[in-house]
């Protein structure tokens, strides 16, 4: 059966846990899974610039035995207005899966509707589910588990925050998002995460005070205040997010053994200070590495579901 990964809850909680288990296994033995041996190809389509997402997926596909085929808007007909549904049907004839990083979430849902191979959301304006998998793996490594871990996200209630709410609830985390009024996660996403938490023991909360969120947190997480495509809002966002910087004072409110996460790229001196990013509690570069291992595990899972020799 063809499965897509467009939002975090396209996996069940048990499937999410299985993907994390496989990612941990592949981190220890990077060539233990070869579901793309042939090589089979995977299309990696970027309508939005990337460093970590692009490199992690290209390396993941290669280490799984496959061949990445990288497309961007400039070098393909997508940039000239070819309908995404046509692209979906054509690429499905060539490749084993399609990875898309885009702006509007409707782009990826349309792609999945017309594709006949698995589709992976490598980032949309609504969700960043691949990032959340890497975040959970990093937390599990550092904390020895996920159930009951207190995660405080401080900053823009963006795609990263939305995925942390949903994926965190699925894993049994207690997730608190601190964002100023007007920049909080969509109520529908918060409600969905709360609904999931009722089944898993996870809890979610949205507040407007970063100190409230950070107090006794096991994980302190932040992201940029201004995402790609929002550059005209930079000045207004800096004003709105004044007081939301993850600095030494905010970190001091968290648990003594708290870790700090950031999905990168970081703007030192804005959402996070250099001293925290480079400090002993930072797990940020382990987190970046885990994008690779979780990408491999996710692709293996989706290929297995499609009958393509994925997770053993």
UniProtKB/Swiss-Prot annotation:
Keyword terms, alphabetized: Amino-acid biosynthesis, Arginine biosynthesis, Cytoplasm, Transferase
Its EC number(s): 2.1.3.3
Top-level EC class as recorded in UniProt: transferase
Pfam families: OTCace, OTCace_N
Main location: cytoplasm
Gene Ontology biological-process entries: arginine biosynthetic process via ornithine; citrulline biosynthetic process; L-arginine biosynthetic process
A single GO cellular-component term on record: cytoplasm
Binding residue positions for L-ornithine: 159, 223, 227-228
InterPro entries per the UniProt record, alphabetical: Asp/Orn_carbamoyltranf_P-bd, Asp/Orn_carbamoylTrfase, Asp/Orn_carbamoylTrfase_sf, Asp_carbamoyltransf_Asp/Orn-bd, Orn/put_carbamltrans, OTCase_ArgI
Molecular-function GO term, any one: amino acid binding
Highest rank taxon of the organism: Bacteria
Keyword Kinase: no
Compartment(s): Cytoplasm
Entry-linked HAMAP family: OTCase
Role played: Reversibly catalyzes the transfer of the carbamoyl group from carbamoyl phosphate (CP) to the N(epsilon) atom of ornithine (ORN) to produce L-citrulline.
Matches recorded under PANTHER family: ORNITHINE CARBAMOYLTRANSFERASE, MITOCHONDRIAL (PTHR45753), ORNITHINE TRANSCARBAMYLASE, MITOCHONDRIAL (PTHR45753:SF3)
Name used for this protein in its record: Ornithine carbamoyltransferase
Annotated organism of origin: Acidothermus cellulolyticus (strain ATCC 43068 / DSM 8971 / 11B)
